[in-house]
């Protein structure tokens, strides 16, 4: 399915011509600090793609604030607006985490830090490994059934109910498991929620996560490119983070490169690739905006819902 009929299509060359002040641009040092492993996002992308997008999000944010104010005045109520929630979805290894960090830094810059912007990843809403093992679904980690959807729904409900302090579970990619500790966000204005599952919908639930989102983005690329990036990232991690004996994946530094490649390909072909085709990719057309990356990691096309 390639249903972009209800989207405006902007090739990169057209999108980059949208007018926006360059005052909000990041420095090379700031970008380097937030760039993910094997993510080749550049200052050119920041200037040509993300600045116009941040302005668009700011327009949506101000519109939401205005409409809420008008409604409260009409209803003679004095309730502040719930946080503006931005969802960011896409496959493993497509660059979601870096993009989410870019969003946060640029929104902080755009609003001159007069708005509290928080970043949340849905990894913390996975069931702990112990639970996944007990249920026999450790090999389905990242699939819809591996997430504590009730906990995620409560988190979203608390946000939209203007609860003053909202608790967020934390996840470690080092130990490959949910941590015991949590963090609390206090009265945020804008919340960016990043994860492969944020646009998924369970037909048996009364509420869909998308019911809570004010703006949603899907990071897209051809599967062959994502698979290649996944393998490149795996081998980079094998030479760095996996070398620590406490890492969940440390054993894969002790086998040959060919054996490690066989393992990584197996993970893609039986888990990540399957999850992409069966669960993640089909959520693309639920997004308000789709960013499509080319083989070179650069965003080539932008699709904005009409």
Curated annotation (Swiss-Prot):
SUPFAM superfamilies: P-loop containing nucleoside triphosphate hydrolases (SSF52540). One of its GO terms (biological process) is coenzyme A biosynthetic process. It is found in: Cytoplasm. ATP binds at residues 90-97. Pathway: Cofactor biosynthesis; coenzyme A biosynthesis; CoA from (R)-pantothenate: step 1/5. It catalyses: (R)-pantothenate + ATP = (R)-4'-phosphopantothenate + ADP + H(+). It comes from the Bacteria. Its EC number is 2.7.1.33. It is an enzyme of class 2 (transferase). Transmembrane segments: none annotated. InterPro entries: P-loop_NTPase, PanK, PRK/URK. Pfam families: PRK. GO terms for cellular component: cytoplasm. Keywords: ATP-binding, Coenzyme A biosynthesis, Cytoplasm, Kinase, Nucleotide-binding, Transferase. Its main location: cytoplasm. One of its GO terms (molecular function) is pantothenate kinase activity. PANTHER family: URIDINE KINASE. Belongs to the prokaryotic pantothenate kinase family. This is Pantothenate kinase. It comes from Listeria monocytogenes serotype 4a (strain HCC23). The lineage of its organism: Bacteria, Bacillati, Bacillota, Bacilli, Bacillales.
